């Protein structure tokens, strides 16, 4: 994975087509192995496209299940559902995101006032800790915008339990530098490693596990392999899933944002799009490589939207929508949702309505619901057909 990754719908479909042969049992058997940045990853690396919905979760699953028996692709399908689970969980626990921002600010204050902590932090970010593997992953993150999922878990565990650094500062580092940095997946994954998501059950990076799944490349010493999990005084409250907004009929302005860049498939009802605007809301302090990727993905979506709806499509400026009602895809908790204009109508995809209600607790609820969700999609009259190989409306 490199900084020059092409973020477009066409590139996403091409990447998906090339990844399909690796989504069967071979994926389940090899996905935990990190062979390093110079080797093709053992995972599919579809996440930068899924994060911006240049690919839709349901179309990826449909495509995979059209190529493999469900039993052969079960592990891959579950991993796609993890992404939807995290989004639904943060949507029903928004105080986690608010608290994360508070902890980032608190952590930065500690860095400014505690020289010892600041030195450990700076060494960790620069890859100067002397911990084998960790320093390599720090460099890989900054230079490529990518880490294998298992490396992310090891890195986070070492950051929290061996280096004793604030977990929120590590999550912030990832969100600013990862090309697939997703507010929900990133924040909740760091909380899971810390033992906050599944309370009292942290993920512990063990030297032997690292040696095994890096095929002997790394064998770190000095890791804390018996840490106490982090804790919170008050668990975050579960809130009802907010309802989508009623859609107007007639002419509308469509607002695109970085959480959903597939306007061709949005369920817009009788609304007729006559103007399209693109809203760029990067993670605060995002690396230049991430900003460029976001901008390229948005530019591609605007071109496609203009072709699909036959109207102007450009980045938003003041007064871009005129007197038209503004319609937008549902923006889950994160930077885009925080800057949506007041009064815009949010439309939510059927996929999210199927998955998110089961995401209020642990992943097991979603996992148990997978067969029903897939069957419901198959039976729904409006289920989206496969779109692989097409760059226009499905």
Where are these regions (language model features)?
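Active-site-proximal binding-pocket segments
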Residues: 50, 55-58, 63, 69-247
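Trp/Phe/Arg-rich N-terminal binding region typifying the photolyase-homology
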Residues: 2-17, 21-78, 82, 87-88, ...
């Amino acid at each position: 994975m490199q900084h020059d990754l092409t973020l477009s719908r066409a590139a996403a479909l091409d990447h998906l087509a090339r990844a399909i042969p690796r989504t069967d049992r071979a994926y389940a058997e090899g996905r935990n192995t990190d062979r390093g940045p110079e080797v093709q990853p053992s995972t599919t690396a579809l996440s930068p496209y899924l994060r911006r919905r240049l690919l839709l979760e349901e179309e990826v699953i449909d495509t995979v299940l059209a190529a493999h028996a469900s039993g052969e692709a079960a592990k891959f399908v579950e991993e796609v559902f993890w992404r939807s689970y995290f989004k639904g969980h943060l949507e029903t626990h928004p105080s986690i995101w608010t608290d994360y921002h508070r902890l980032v600010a608190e952590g930065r204050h500690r860095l400014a006032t505690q020289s010892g902590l600041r030195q450990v932090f700076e060494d960790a970010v620069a890859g100067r800790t002397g911990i084998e593997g960790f320093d390599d992953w720090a460099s890989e993150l900054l230079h490529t915008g990518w880490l294998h999922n298992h490396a992310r878990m090891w890195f986070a565990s070492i950051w929290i339990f061996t280096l004793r650094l604030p977990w929120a500062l590590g999550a912030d580092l990832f969100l600013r530098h990862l090309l697939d940095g997703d507010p929900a997946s990133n924040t909740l994954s760091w909380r899971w490693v810390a033992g906050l998501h599944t309370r009292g059950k942290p993920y512990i990076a063990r030297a032997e596990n690292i040696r095994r799944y890096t095929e002997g490349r790394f064998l770190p010493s000095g890791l804390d392999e018996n840490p106490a999990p982090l804790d919170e005084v008050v668990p975050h409250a579960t809130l009802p899933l907010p309802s989508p907004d009623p859609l107007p009929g007639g002419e509308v302005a469509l607002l695109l944002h970085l959480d959903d860049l597939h306007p061709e498939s949005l369920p817009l009802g009788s609304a007729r799009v006559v103007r399209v605007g693109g809203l760029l809301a990067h993670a605060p302090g995002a690396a230049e490589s991430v900003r460029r990727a976001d901008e390229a993905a948005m530019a591609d979506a605007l071109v496609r939207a203009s072709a699909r709806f036959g109207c102007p499509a450009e980045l938003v400026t003041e007064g871009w929508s005129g007197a038209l009602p503004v319609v937008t895809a549902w923006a889950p908790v994160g930077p885009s949702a925080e800057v949506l204009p007041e009064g815009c109508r949010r439309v939510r995809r059927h996929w999210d309505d199927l998955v998110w209600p089961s995401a209020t607790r642990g992943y097991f609820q979603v996992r148990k619901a997978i067969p029903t969700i897939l069957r419901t999609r198959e039976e729904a009259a409006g289920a989206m057909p496969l779109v692989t190989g097409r760059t226009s409306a499905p």
